């Protein structure tokens, strides 16, 4: 019986990791790599492995509540997952990322290896020094221990999560509530489209002039060859005249090229403005449908929760409190105290906890992947380097993000579900610090996002579609 159960547990672990790895590979090739030809096999393998181990951490949180695996199997799975993920994040990814950048720059393989090793040494030193400024576990057992490494990764990952959450807490109501949706007239869009067409046609006409000027310069150079057969005096006069004409043509070409560049920039701005107005018009039309009304109500509900979260985070920062239960669990507890419906409060709380943790995990994964796609396309389109370098950087961020989410989700678990997580991560990790740090960065990010979105909304209302 025990042998069969061990086979079952091993099959579940291997199958889940394989499925998650395949999902990461599919996401990379179908959603990120779809516009790029450069596809390194090792980069794809690293991304899929980091994705699998990262999502497996969140899966193990669910396994703590749902008894799919035994305690021993979960403990082994936790340790192996954390060991492999930290090995990738702290050692392998920094080294290989630097090595690949040096190789892409034309550095020889031996020198690239030495340069990557030196970079890894500097990275580890900076990684160690980071712990001086934050509450860290005792270093009696050395630096390369699970609590030490997890604590430092947690600082970076929690900071990233707080920044994204702060922006989302402000941007989500702003995007959903119909109060902030503009009413756009079709005549305004048509007027801008005419400007765009006129700008494009003018740009094309000036490009044709540039080509004609270049052809004329080439003809003058050809006529210079024919003038060599003429008299000496005619050659001198012809040379002077052609020189003046060529200088004038080159000056005209430079002026035309500058005008074309300005017109292309104007056309780009006009196109973006037309696109934004079309989106705003579609959003206004959608807001008048029944789905739009539901989304509007959802926006107000999210606004209430986001305001509550911001106030609780501000309270945690100001009064240095460690935080309380999540609002959903609090509301359920109040409801059970007011209305006796004959339901076991402990049992209902357990199912509510499972549902809430599942929602946290789904929202966390979905939100991260959405921001991952936006960041990838934004960085890749401005030409910051090869797509392989961007994918390696995102792999590093992804692992830190999901590992840090465990430090925060742990507090939402009931005490009986925290045991293995606390033991594996390290009992002397300052878990409350990460919640206070998250709240501080969350409040700062939300406030900054509120200021920026308010300025954007004000400027948009004062001048809806003015383009200089």
Swiss-Prot record:
Highest taxon listed in the record's lineage: Eukaryota
Annotated membrane topology: Multi-pass membrane protein
Coiled coil: 243-279
Record-level GO BP terms: post-embryonic development; response to abscisic acid; vegetative to reproductive phase transition of meristem
UniProt activity-regulation remark: The GTPase activity is Mg(2+) dependent and is strongly inhibited by the interaction with GPA1.
Transmembrane annotation, as ranges: 7-27, 45-65, 82-102, 114-134, 153-173, 297-319, 345-365, 389-409, 437-457
Keyword Cell membrane found: yes
InterPro entries per UniProt: ABA_GPCR_dom, Golgi_pH-regulator_cons_dom, GPHR/GTG
Main location: membrane
Induction profile: Not induced by abscisic acid, cold, salt or drought treatments.
One Gene Ontology cellular component annotation held by this UniProt entry: intracellular membrane-bounded organelle
GO molecular function terms listed in the Swiss-Prot or TrEMBL record: abscisic acid binding; GTP binding; GTPase binding
Subcellular location(s) per record: Cell membrane; Golgi apparatus membrane; Endoplasmic reticulum membrane
Keywords in alphabetical order: Cell membrane, Coiled coil, Endoplasmic reticulum, Golgi apparatus, GTP-binding, Membrane, Nucleotide-binding, Receptor, Transmembrane, Transmembrane helix
Residues involved in GTP binding: 382-411
Tissue: Expressed in cotyledons, leaves, stems, roots, flowers and guard cells.
Consequence of gene disruption: No visible phenotype; due to the redundancy with GTG2. The double mutants gtg1 and gtg2 are hyposensitive to abscisic acid.
PANTHER family in alphabetical order: G-PROTEIN COUPLED RECEPTOR 89-RELATED (PTHR15948), GOLGI PH REGULATOR A-RELATED (PTHR15948:SF0)
Other remarks in the entry: Has both a topology similar to GPCRs and a GTP-binding/GTPase activity.
Family note: Belongs to the Golgi pH regulator (TC 1.A.38) family.
Described function: Abscisic acid receptor. The GDP-bound form exhibits greater abscisic acid binding than the GTP-bound form. Required for seedling growth and fertility.
Protein name, per record: GPCR-type G protein 1
Organism: Arabidopsis thaliana (Mouse-ear cress)
Lineage of producing organism: Eukaryota, Viridiplantae, Streptophyta, Embryophyta, Tracheophyta
Gene responsible for this protein: GTG1
